[in-house]
């Protein structure tokens, strides 16, 4: 027996909707821009080049 949606997500569906209901991809992009997250000011960005294959041994 598969759990019902309200059993899996008791807090509700949240901001997630079908693309058909959101008005297509443009509505989805607007939702993404409205829900943009900010990086903490103390975030230490020392990742160098993650896609640099020259240093693979």
From Swiss-Prot:
A GO biological-process term: positive regulation of cell population proliferation
Alphabetical keyword list: Cytoplasm, Nucleus, Signalosome
Primary localisation category: nucleus
Gene Ontology cellular component annotations, sorted alphabetically: chromatin; COP9 signalosome; cytoplasm; nucleoplasm; nucleus
Domain of life: Eukaryota
Entry's localization field: Nucleus; Cytoplasm; Nucleus, Nucleoplasm
Function, in words: Component of the COP9 signalosome complex (CSN), a complex involved in various cellular and developmental processes. The CSN complex is an essential regulator of the ubiquitin (Ubl) conjugation pathway by mediating the deneddylation of the cullin subunits of SCF-type E3 ligase complexes, leading to decrease the Ubl ligase activity. May play a role in cell proliferation.
Subunit structure: Component of the CSN complex, probably composed of cops1, cops2, cops3, cops4, cops5, cops6, cops7, cops8 and cops9.
Family (UniProt): Belongs to the CSN9 family.
Protein name: COP9 signalosome complex subunit 9
Protein's gene: cops9
